[in-house]
Amino acid sequence: MSTYESLMVMIGFANLIGGIMTWVISLLTLLFMLRKKDTHPIYITVKEKCLHEDPPIKG
């Protein structure tokens, strides 16, 4: 096998591994986001900010 062919095989293999790793990381991120939905810092700050700016109307 020539140098060019071996280089192409290595690039293809790296591309395959990169694609698989991208899918794994995105699935893990999605699962983490779904599991930790209420404890996300941005979600909490937006919730608190809304409560401070617009207090609930009582009676």
Swiss-Prot record:
Subcellular location: Cell membrane
Coiled coil: none
Transmembrane segment boundaries: 7-27
Major place of residence: membrane
Annotated keywords: Cell membrane, Membrane, Toxin-antitoxin system, Transmembrane, Transmembrane helix
Keyword Transmembrane belongs to the record: yes
One cellular component term from this protein's GO annotations in UniProt: plasma membrane
Topology in membrane: Single-pass membrane protein
Cell membrane is among the record's keywords: yes
Induction of its expression: The antisense RNA ratA acts as an antitoxin by annealing to the mRNA of txpA and causing its degradation, protecting the cell from TxpA by blocking the production of the toxin. A type I toxin-antitoxin (TA) system, where expression of the proteinaceous toxin is controlled by an antisense sRNA.
Top-level taxon of origin: Bacteria
Segment forming the signal sequence: none
Function: Toxic component of a type I toxin-antitoxin (TA) system. Overexpression of txpA causes cell lysis; the TxpA protein has been suggested to act on the cell membrane or might possibly block cell wall synthesis. Overexpression in E.coli is not toxic.
Further remarks about this protein from its record: Encoded in a 48-kb, phage-like element known as skin.
Name assigned to this protein: Toxin TxpA
Lineage, opening ranks: Bacteria, Bacillati, Bacillota, Bacilli, Bacillales
